[in-house]
Swiss-Prot record:
Testis. Residues 227-264 are annotated as: Disordered. Keywords: Membrane, Transmembrane, Transmembrane helix. The chain crosses the membrane at residues 31-51, 74-94, 133-153. Its main location: membrane. The keyword Transmembrane applies. InterPro entries: WBS28. This is Transmembrane protein 270. It is found in: Membrane. Pfam families: WBS28. Residues 227-236 have a biased composition (Polar residues). It is a multi-pass membrane protein. It comes from Mus musculus (Mouse). Coiled coil: none annotated.
Length: 264
């Protein structure tokens, strides 16, 4: 009974891996087609070499066959390096444009907000709140730019490392190619996972910062409302003074005359 869930989980993992690999193959179908063409060319050269060896003239072709395999392997390595370099080049070309567009959107929103300050000031949204929001957007953009630069630098470093690893000897190139490709795939998968987690952390951090700023703005609004209520109560007028009624003065009669001085 316990083995059935394990088998199911193993099948689900295999299906997920197969789905990921199929998605990667669909995304990189042009490179896959080129790789298949290279394999077909190598196989064709190998078959021609076998046929010529069977005919008796395979001495020259036997010498040329390793050279063809080496050139095909080097061309494959060159194309793999170009595909690795294409990602940082795309990031370098389109990353600043995306950052510029996001900055334009932020500046437009800030301008609109500052244009409606006369409407928002009674609600308690002061210019300091808008300034804090704008600074948080700038900080998030700077973090995204630094993350893209770090990823580009790491990709360039790895591409250089792998390009140096292909050079030492021809036999080692042919033997270590699958291991290098496997290590490269694992490294790319690890980097994409780290990048996705970093982006998720960045989005969460910006969301928390925005919520904190909104909470501070609402608290400031309530404080301003309370202060305005206190001011309105103070400026509504002084408390009513107790005036002496006239009836009391009339009932008591006229005031007694003052005593005259001896000179008068």
């Amino acid at each position: 009974m316990e083995a059935a869930p394990r088998v199911r989980s193993g099948l689900l993992r295999i299906l997920l891996r197969a789905g990921r690999l199929s998605a990667l193959l669909i995304q990189n179908r042009t490179h896959l087609y080129r790789f298949l063409l290279l394999k077909m060319a190598i196989f064709q050269h190998w078959v021609l070499g076998l046929a010529q060896e069977a005919r008796g003239s395979g001495s020259d072709q036997a010498r040329q066959l390793p050279e063809v395999i080496i050139t095909c392997a080097l061309s494959l390595a060159l194309r793999a390096g170009l595909t690795l370099l294409w990602v940082p080049m795309w990031l370098l070309l389109w990353g600043p444009r995306l950052a510029y567009r996001v900055g334009l959107c932020c500046t437009r929103t800030v301008r609109l907000a500052l244009g409606h300050l006369c409407v928002c000031e009674p609600l308690g949204l002061s210019p300091a709140t808008f300034r804090d929001l704008f600074l948080s957007c700038l900080h998030s953009l700077m973090l995204v730019a630094l993350l893209l630069l770090l990823l580009t630098w790491k990709l360039m470093q790895k591409a250089h490392h792998f390009s140096l690893g292909w050079l030492p000897s021809q036999n080692s190139v042919l033997l270590e190619a699958p291991a290098l490709l496997r290590r490269l795939y694992l490294w790319v998968e690890h980097r994409t996972t780290l990048t996705s987690w970093n982006l998720a952390y960045l989005v969460t951090w910006t969301t928390c910062l925005a919520s904190h700023l909104l909470q501070a703005a609402f608290e400031h609004t309530t404080q301003l409302a309370q202060a305005q209520e206190v001011k309105s109560q103070e400026t509504s007028g002084p408390p009513p003074q107790f005036l002496i009624p006239e009836s009391s003065t009339t009932e008591s009669g006229p005031l007694p005359p003052q005593p005259e001085t001896p000179g008068e």
